[in-house]
C-alpha cells in the first residue's frame, strides 16, 4: 500500500477553458489525488490564466484543429516544447500522467521530453484516425516509453490497437457521483423536460437528431420542454426548429458544475444523440448519478456504458423516429 506523498504531473492536451469530458476527468482526478495528500500539477493549454485552478499551469494559447469529427483546441510546436520541458524540470515529478499522448499536443511533447515513470491514458475512439496513421512512425517510439497504458473504454482500446499495434488496460472514467446525487432540483427544469449538454454546434453531438424527433414527441406530450446547456450560438440552431416549437427550447449557455448537478437532478430525461467519435460518455454517468433517465444513441461507447440497455435506453444512431419512440415510451412509463 502506498503511504508516501507523490509529486504527480498530469498533462491535459485540450484547452482547459473549453468544456469537455477529458478536461472534466482530469480535473476530478487531480482533485481526488490532492485530497489524498499528493502534490499535483496539471499542465494544460488555456486562452488566459483567468479562473484557472491553483493546480493548473497554463502552457499557452491553443489553436483549433479538426479532429475526430469535432474541433480540438490543442498546443504544439517548438515554443510549447520548451514550456513543457521547463514544467517537467521545475516539477521534479515522481510520475507523469499523459492524456491522449498519440495526438500532436503537449501530451506527446511531454512524452518526448520526459524520462522516468509515465502513464498514458487514451480517450479517443474512431474507426480510422488519419492523423495517427500519418505520424505513426514518430509516435511509436514515444508510446513505447510509457510505463503503462490506460484506455477509458473498450472502444478506445480498440482504436489504440488498430492504429499503433499496442494494447492498454481498460479503466473507465470516474466521477464524484455524490456531487450529482445531491443536486438540488430546480422547478423550472422539472416536469416533462428533456435535457442536453454539450458543444451543440458540432454535428457529431447530434442535437439535430433531437430537433427532428421533437415534433413527434410533442404530439404525445404537449407540455414537453427541451433545455440545452453548453457553449455555442443558439441563433443558427433556432432557425432549424419548427416555429411552433421554438418556445419549448431554452438555451442556457455554459453552466457551472453546481448548475449541472442541479440540472441532472431536475430533468425527466437526458438525451445523448451523439452520432460517433465518443469513447466513453462521462455525461451519461453524470446524468445517471443525478437520477435522470438516460436515452442515448447506440454507438459502441454508449452501448457499453449503459450495459447494452440495462442502465438506460438506446435508440438507433441518427434515427430521429426511433429516438422519438424511445422517449415517448419513457414518458408514458413515467405517467403510470
Spans of features found by a protein language model:
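Conserved donor-binding/catalytic core segment of Leloir-type glycosyltransferases
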Residues: 186-205, 211-215, 227
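Glycosyltransferase donor-sugar binding loop
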Residues: 46-48, 197, 225-238, 253
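Membrane-proximal helix-turn-helix segments that form the acceptor-binding/catalytic region
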Residues: 126, 132-149, 162-163
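Short hydrophobic beta-strand element within catalytic cores of glycosyltransferases
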Residues: 269, 293-296
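N-terminal strand-loop element at the rim of the active site
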Residues: 5, 12-19, 26-27, 31-79, ...
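Nucleotide-activated donor-binding/catalytic signature segment of Leloir-type glycosyltransferases, i.e.
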Residues: 237-259
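Conserved acidic donor-binding segment of nucleotide-sugar-dependent glycosyltransferases
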Residues: 308-309, 313-320, 329-335
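Carbohydrate-associated surface elements
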Residues: 155, 174
Amino acid at each position: 500500500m502506498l503511504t508516501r506523498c507523490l509529486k504527480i504531473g498530469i498533462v491535459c492536451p485540450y484547452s482547459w477553458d473549453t468544456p469537455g469530458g477529458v478536461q472534466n476527468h482530469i480535473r476530478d482526478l487531480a482533485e481526488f489525488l490532492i485530497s489524498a495528500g499528493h502534490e499535483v500539477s496539471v499542465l494544460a493549454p488555456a486562452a488566459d490564466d483567468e479562473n484557472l485552478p491553483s493546480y493548473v499551469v497554463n502552457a499557452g494559447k491553443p489553436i483549433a484543429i479538426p479532429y475526430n469529427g469535432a474541433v480540438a483546441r490543442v498546443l504544439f510546436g517548438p515554443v510549447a516544447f520548451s514550456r513543457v520541458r521547463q514544467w517537467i524540470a521545475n516539477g521534479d515529478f515522481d510520475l507523469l500522467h499523459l492524456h491522449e499522448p498519440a495526438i500532436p499536443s503537449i501530451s506527446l511533447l511531454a512524452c518526448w521530453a520526459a524520462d522516468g515513470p509515465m502513464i498514458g491514458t487514451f480517450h479517443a475512439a474512431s474507426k480510422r484516425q488519419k492523423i495517427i496513421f500519418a505520424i505513426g512512425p514518430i509516435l511509436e517510439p514515444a508510446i513505447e516509453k510509457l510505463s503503462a497504458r490506460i484506455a477509458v473504454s473498450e472502444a478506445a482500446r480498440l482504436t489504440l490497437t488498430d492504429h499503433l499495434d499496442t494494447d492498454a488496460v481498460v479503466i473507465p472514467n470516474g466521477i464524484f457521483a455524490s456531487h450529482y446525487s445531491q443536486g438540488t432540483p430546480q422547478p423550472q427544469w422539472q416536469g416533462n423536460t428533456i435535457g442536453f449538454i454539450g458543444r451543440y454546434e458540432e454535428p457529431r453531438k447530434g442535437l439535430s437528431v433531437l430537433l427532428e424527433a421533437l415534433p413527434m414527441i410533442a404530439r404525445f406530450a404537449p407540455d414537453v420542454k427541451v433545455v440545452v446547456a453548453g457553449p455555442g450560438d443558439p441563433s443558427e440552431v433556432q432557425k432549424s426548429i419548427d416555429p411552433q416549437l421554438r418556445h419549448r427550447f431554452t438555451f442556457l449557455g455554459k453552466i457551472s458544475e453546481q448548475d449541472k448537478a442541479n440540472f441532472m437532478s431536475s430533468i425527466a430525461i437526458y438525451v445523448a444523440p451523439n452520432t460517433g467519435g465518443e469513447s466513453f460518455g462521462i455525461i451519461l454517468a453524470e446524468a445517471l448519478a443525478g437520477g435522470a433517465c438516460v436515452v442515448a444513441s447506440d454507438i459502441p461507447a454508449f452501448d457499453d456504458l449503459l450495459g447494452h440497455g440495462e442502465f438506460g435506453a438506446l435508440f438507433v444512431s441518427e434515427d430521429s423516429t426511433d429516438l422519438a419512440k424511445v422517449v415517448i415510451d419513457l414518458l408514458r412509463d413515467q405517467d403510470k
